């Protein structure tokens, strides 16, 4: 029972305002480094500001997205590696913006924890700032919530919010997607940020410690390899859209894999035929499939399997688009074609994934 003669405090309840102020001081230079046309990227006010006119748009449509990184944060917590999970947070939202033809403009984050450690939180924000710089968007604000009793000490969760813009009339997917268009894939960097509940189950069943060498990448620890950041496709895809005029649609391959994500950008009545032999399956996916005895269908519905972004491209401009994407640093594969959807479903697979280790 609480002694009624004792004066209770917020700090005594587990919330340290001074730690929050120290965090703000630590991250101000990181945030400032994300400044871009339209935003000075200063924090400390009650709201973030963005000047849309200064960003150079004439008749813009705003596009918004928000996402998290799922249970990938648990691996960051267990390994103590916190400086890359913020990149994932940015990538998950801004990749969804570029799918609609939008240029990311600004980003806000939400960080919730049981007990605030300013240095850990600053490492996370450093990753967020790095992701924002790579995507060309400003980090204009965020929220840090210290919630003792809701989260255990050391645990945290993240959410991100991104806003972008596209000129009216240039939004994707285009209405001209048609049977015969080409389907190309942009390589992923790894598992990205989906499927980690299954990944963690497989790791636990394997008995391999996160600090041990990764069986599929011996130069890295298992935990470090699984924390490889989600690839950001923003600048390369925007370049392909603007320079070629031949990109009709984009699909960010997240939870649901090809099976659920590609149909989201296709007109009713159309599907795609994918040649699985055209996929370069990354070693991490081969290991997960073998170690977890995960069947091909489940792999394709859960993971990106080596392709993080799919583009629907005008057939006569495939090489032009591939050249632009390659020059922008992407590894590109020809995956298949847009087809008239039939009884087989909207995503038809030919061949098999190469899951042999």
UniProtKB/Swiss-Prot annotation:
Annotated Gene3D superfamilies: PurM-like C-terminal domain, PurM-like, N-terminal domain
Reactions it catalyzes: 2-formamido-N(1)-(5-O-phospho-beta-D-ribosyl)acetamidine + ATP = 5-amino-1-(5-phospho-beta-D-ribosyl)imidazole + ADP + phosphate + H(+)
GO cellular component: cytosol
InterPro entries in alphabetical order: PurM-like_C_dom, PurM-like_C_sf, PurM-like_N, PurM-like_N_sf, PurM_cligase
Record bears the keyword Cytoplasm: yes
Protein name as it appears in the record: Phosphoribosylformylglycinamidine cyclo-ligase
Keywords carried by this UniProt record: ATP-binding, Cytoplasm, Ligase, Nucleotide-binding, Purine biosynthesis
Membership in a protein family: Belongs to the AIR synthase family.
EC number in record: 6.3.3.1
Organism this protein belongs to: Nitrobacter winogradskyi (strain ATCC 25391 / DSM 10237 / CIP 104748 / NCIMB 11846 / Nb-255)
Principal location class: cytoplasm
Gene Ontology molecular functions: ATP binding; phosphoribosylamine-glycine ligase activity; phosphoribosylformylglycinamidine cyclo-ligase activity
Localisation: Cytoplasm
One Gene Ontology biological process: adenine biosynthetic process
Pathway it works in: Purine metabolism; IMP biosynthesis via de novo pathway; 5-amino-1-(5-phospho-D-ribosyl)imidazole from N(2)-formyl-N(1)-(5-phospho-D-ribosyl)glycinamide: step 2/2
């Amino acid at each position: 029972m609480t002694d009624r003669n004792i004066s209770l405090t917020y700090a005594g309840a587990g919330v340290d305002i001074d730690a929050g102020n120290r965090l703000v001081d630590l991250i101000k230079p990181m945030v400032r480094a994300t400044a871009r046309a339209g935003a000075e990227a200063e924090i400390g006010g009650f709201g973030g500001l963005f000047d849309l006119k200064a960003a150079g748009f004439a008749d813009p449509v705003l596009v918004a997205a928000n996402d998290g990184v799922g249970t990938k944060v648990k691996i960051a917590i267990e390994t103590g590696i916190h400086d890359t999970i913020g990149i994932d947070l940015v990538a998950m939202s801004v990749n969804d913006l570029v799918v609609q033809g939008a240029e990311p403009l600004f980003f806000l984050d939400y960080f919730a924890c049981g007990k605030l450690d300013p240095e850990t939180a600053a490492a996370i924000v450093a990753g967020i700032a790095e992701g924002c710089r790579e995507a060309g968007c400003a980090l204009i604000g965020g929220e840090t919530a210290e919630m003792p009793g809701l989260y255990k000490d050391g645990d945290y969760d993240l959410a991100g919010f991104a806003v972008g813009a596209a000129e009216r009339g240039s939004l994707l997917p285009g209405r001209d997607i048609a049977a015969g268009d080409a389907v190309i894939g942009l390589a992923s960097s790894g598992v990205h940020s989906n499927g980690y509940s299954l990944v963690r189950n497989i790791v636990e069943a394997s008995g391999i410690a996160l600090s041990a060498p990764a069986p599929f990448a011996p130069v890295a620890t298992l935990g470090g390899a699984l924390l490889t950041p989600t690839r950001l496709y923003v600048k390369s895809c925007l370049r392909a859209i603007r320079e070629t005029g031949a990109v009709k649609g984009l699909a960010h391959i997240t939870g649901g894999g090809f099976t659920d994500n590609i149909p989201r950008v296709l007109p009713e009545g159309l599907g795609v035929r994918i040649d699985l032999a055209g996929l370069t399956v990354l070693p991490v996916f081969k290991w997960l499939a073998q170690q977890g005895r995960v069947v091909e269908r489940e792999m394709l519905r859960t993971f990106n399997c080596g392709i993080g972004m799919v583009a629907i491209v005008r057939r006569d401009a495939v090489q032009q688009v591939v050249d632009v994407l390659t020059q922008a640093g992407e590894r590109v594969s020809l995956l298949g074609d847009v087809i008239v959807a039939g009884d087989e479903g909207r995503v038809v697979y030919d061949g098999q994934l190469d899951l042999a280790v």
